[in-house]
From Swiss-Prot:
Gene, per the UniProt record: nuoD
A GO MF label: NADH:ubiquinone reductase (non-electrogenic) activity
Protein name per the record: NADH-quinone oxidoreductase subunit D
Cell location: Cell inner membrane
Enzyme class: translocase
Membrane topology, as annotated: Peripheral membrane protein
PROSITE patterns, sorted: COMPLEX1_49K
Main location class: membrane
The EC number(s) this enzyme carries: 7.1.1.-
Keywords noted in UniProt: Cell inner membrane, Cell membrane, Membrane, NAD, Quinone, Translocase, Transport, Ubiquinone
Family: Belongs to the complex I 49 kDa subunit family.
């Protein structure tokens, strides 16, 4: 009689649903997954080691490139750790700007997630809808920092600069007539803050569109309900955080439980799931986008009424103004020293965690009193989530593995580092 063996299949790294460079070795009994073994390291760039040879401020752009869909939130964790070691206070206006851009980044991340997740499962329209909205938020990134993705906007002590008074407008081209151009620039006639306000005013209707396409869609529910179930106890034991933990019914959100910046002044709710399956995690993330709108609106209202500095007045950390550099030799020397030698951080260690769109993003920073970190440890939320993939996928079909990878919202920049 023939011996029956399980079949081993390589999923990725060149697979459209592998979310980057994931290689999964699947052990299959027919089409049912018996074991899933994730192989990581294909995007390893030694970020933690590189940071040891760069000044504290030079490592800020490396943070953008970790989870390259949630750029500014990565920076936030890093600058918070530096500020704790330095013992400096951040101006109130800078704190509100940071919270506003954290929520813009959360929406950016969740739009990418809902588009890619739906595309993996087989619904293409949502992907196109989501990227339509992402484009506006990318333009906001570009307006404040000059870059659509890797912004390096947060700095130790505050932010790079205040919100600009004018929003860049679309230019005339061969494919746009005057009427179309006027409509496209309608919301861009005011300041960046006006544009963000306009976006968050119309964004809830966009979320309604995604929900119309997906939430009660029979095929969508068949693909997500009851797939990748994680109990609250196991979610805690496996180190899940963010929507992965809240989807299992545990209301743990660092913005509420361990507030940083001005989150303790914000009025918002923490959505939680009931069943701990892919569908509940989908509902949690969609509701998170609605809560981000609430937080952003509160920040916009405060920023309109209150002016002020956006950088600390500690000149050992803060660079001189551009005007000062062009008129004053001492300011020019100060700027040169600050960006070549950097500032020295007192000896000690600090851990700073932020509520990243994917979970708890933590930075453990050790300083020996020099101008470079002695050790930088990055606590990436996706790392723990990927480790739970084996348990979540067992007993499901190959097609469900795609759904589970999608619901984990995996980006390999932060996992491989």
């Amino acid at each position: 009689m023939a011996e029956i063996k399980n079949y081993t299949l390589n999923f990725g790294p060149q697979h459209p649903a592998a979310h980057g460079v994931l290689r999964l070795v699947l052990e299959l009994d027919g089409e049912v997954i018996q074991r899933a073994d994730p192989h990581i390291g294909l995007l390893h760039r030694a970020t933690e080691k590189l940071a040891e040879n760069k000044t504290f401020i030079q490592s800020v752009p490396y943070m953008d490139r970790l989870d390259y869909v949630s750029m500014m939130v990565n920076e936030h964790g890093y600058v918070l750790a530096i500020e704790r070691l330095l013992g400096i206070d951040v101006p109130e206006r800078a704190q509100y700007i940071r919270v506003l851009f954290d929520e813009i980044t959360r929406v950016l991340n969740h739009l990418m997630w809902i588009g890619a997740h739906a595309l993996d499962v087989g619904a293409m329209a949502v992907f196109l809808y989501a990227f339509r909205e992402r484009e506006d938020l990318m333009d906001v990134y570009e307006a404040v920092s000059g870059a659509r993705m890797h912004a390096a906007y947060y700095r130790p002590g505050g932010v790079y600069r205040d919100l600009p008074d004018a929003m860049p407008q679309f230019k005339a081209s061969k494919i746009r007539n005057e009427k179309a151009l006027a409509k496209m620039n309608e919301a861009r006639s005011g300041s960046v803050l006006d544009f963000i306000d306009d976006f968050f005013t119309r964004f809830p209707k966009c979320i309604d569109e995604y929900e119309t396409l997906l939430t009660d869609n029979r095929i969508w529910k068949q693909r997500l309900v009851g797939i990748g179930v994680v109990s609250p106890e196991r979610a805690l034991q496996m180190g899940l955080t963010g929507p992965m933990l809240r989807g299992s019914g545990i209301a743990w959100d660092l913005r509420k439980k361990q507030p940083y910046e001005v989150y303790d002044r914000m009025d918002f709710d923490v959505p939680v799931g009931v069943n701990g399956d892919c569908y509940d995690r989908y509902l949690v993330r969609v509701e998170e986008m609605r809560q981000s709108v609430r937080i952003a609106k509160q920040c916009i209202e405060w920023l309109r009424k209150n002016q002020g500095p956006v950088m600390t007045d500690n000149h050992k950390v803060a660079p001189p103004s551009r005007v000062g550099m062009k008129t004053n030799m001492e300011d020019l020397i100060h700027h040169f020293k600050l960006f070549t030698e950097g500032f020295h951080v007192p000896e000690g260690e600090a851990y700073a965690a932020v509520e990243h769109p994917k979970g708890e993003f933590g930075i453990y920073l050790v300083s020996d009193g020099a101008n470079k970190p002695y050790r930088l440890k990055i606590r990436a939320p996706g790392f723990a989530h990927l480790a739970s993939l084996d348990e979540m996928a067992r007993g499901h079909m190959i097609a469900d593995a795609v759904t589970i990878i999608g619901t984990q919202d995996i980006v390999f920049g932060e996992i491989d580092r």
